Amino acid sequence: MINRRSLLKTGVAAAVATSSVATLALAPVVTLKFHTFMAPQSNVWLNMHKAWMDKVEKESGGRIKFEAYPAMQLGGTPVQLYDQAKDGVVDIIWTLPGNTAGRFPRVEVFELPFMMSNAEATSKAYWEYVQTFAADEFKDVQVLALQVHGPGVIHTTDKLIHSVDDLKGLKIRGPSRPITTLLA
């Protein structure tokens, strides 16, 4: 998610960067602050966030740069990330809407386990759903991407979960309000 001020700066920089080589040389460098709770050694950070930032920097000819802050390095909690983008403290965040129980109620369904079999198809459905039915939940920012991890995996230390029966006897912490309700 990105706040509208940053989107405007990025859009202007991108428009200038694509107009001509001569103009590109004169275009100002835009530096965007990217903040997330993901650890810098995590797969999501290395293979998605960092890779995306590197690609944007390269394709913009170095005119769009990033200050990257994984692992909540700028302070706050994961619950506060959305407000940090909304309030202009940072330009781009990556977070889980389910971390903020009740704030984005219409998209919480996309975090339920056993609801999907293909992360790519479900991520596309998530995007279309938000654009069509839930855009007002994110009205203070410009959503850049939405994704799910497939297929709604439940993580444990030593037991694979294939069905509800596999949960018997386990102590489980739910990542969001609907999942915690289902587990209760």
Set out the residue ranges of the language-model regions.
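Immediate post-signal peptide segment of exported/extracytoplasmic ligand-binding proteins
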Residues: 22-37, 50, 57-65, 159-171
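N-terminal glycine-rich cofactor-binding segment that shapes the pocket for flavin-like pterin cofactors
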Residues: 30, 72, 76-77, 90, ...
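Contiguous mixed-secondary-structure segments that line small-molecule binding/active-site clefts
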Residues: 54, 80-86, 91, 96-184
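Extracytoplasmic "Venus flytrap"
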Residues: 33-50, 71-76
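Hydrophobic alpha-helical targeting segments used for export or membrane insertion
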Residues: 12-20, 27
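Early extracytoplasmic/lumenal segment of secretory-pathway proteins
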Residues: 63-79, 83
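N-terminal secretory signal peptides and thylakoid transit peptides that target proteins
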Residues: 1-15
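Short, polar/charged alpha-helical segment
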Residues: 42-67, 177, 181-184
